[in-house]
């Protein structure tokens, strides 16, 4: 392992940290900074970074089919919590109907 490999792994770690900070800021800005949404966002971030790490390590080992498999499997897995987090964060609040004092027939 040379210095460039170490720098790549450090860059992936910093990218994971920055993405998680962005998810936190996004959810806080929407007013939906809850633990379940944070966990769901973390899972999306983890699988995305893991897919990138899998791709890089497979490329360095010259296993080109493993790159595609990692992107399909882990990248596809990252889409599920990412979509759930995005949809729940942008879900509008339910409107409460005001009850009237009169009875309509």
From Swiss-Prot:
UniProt KW keywords: Cell membrane, Membrane, Transmembrane, Transmembrane helix
Entry keyword Secreted: no
Places the protein is found: Cell membrane
GO cellular component, as recorded: plasma membrane
Keyword hit for Transmembrane helix: yes
Mode of membrane association: Multi-pass membrane protein
Disulfide bonds: none
Main location class: membrane
Ranges annotated as spanning the membrane: 3-23, 35-55, 66-86
UniProt similarity note: Belongs to the PceB family.
Function text: May act as a membrane anchor for the tetrachloroethene reductive dehalogenase PceA.
Protein name in the entry: Probable tetrachloroethene reductive dehalogenase membrane anchor protein
Record organism: Dehalobacter restrictus (strain DSM 9455 / PER-K23)
Lineage of source species: Bacteria, Bacillati, Bacillota, Clostridia, Eubacteriales
């Amino acid at each position: 392992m040379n210095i460039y490999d170490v720098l790549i792994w450090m860059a992936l770690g910093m990218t994971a940290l920055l993405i998680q900070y962005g998810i936190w800021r996004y959810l806080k800005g929407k007013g939906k900074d809850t633990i379940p949404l944070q966990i769901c966002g973390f899972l999306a971030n983890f699988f995305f970074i893991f897919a990138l790490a899998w791709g890089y390590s497979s490329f360095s080992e010259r296993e080109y089919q493993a790159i595609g498999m990692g992107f399909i499997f882990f990248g596809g897995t990252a889409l599920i919590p990412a979509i759930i987090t995005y949809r729940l964060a942008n879900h509008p609040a339910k409107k409460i109907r005001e009850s009237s004092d009169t009875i309509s027939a």
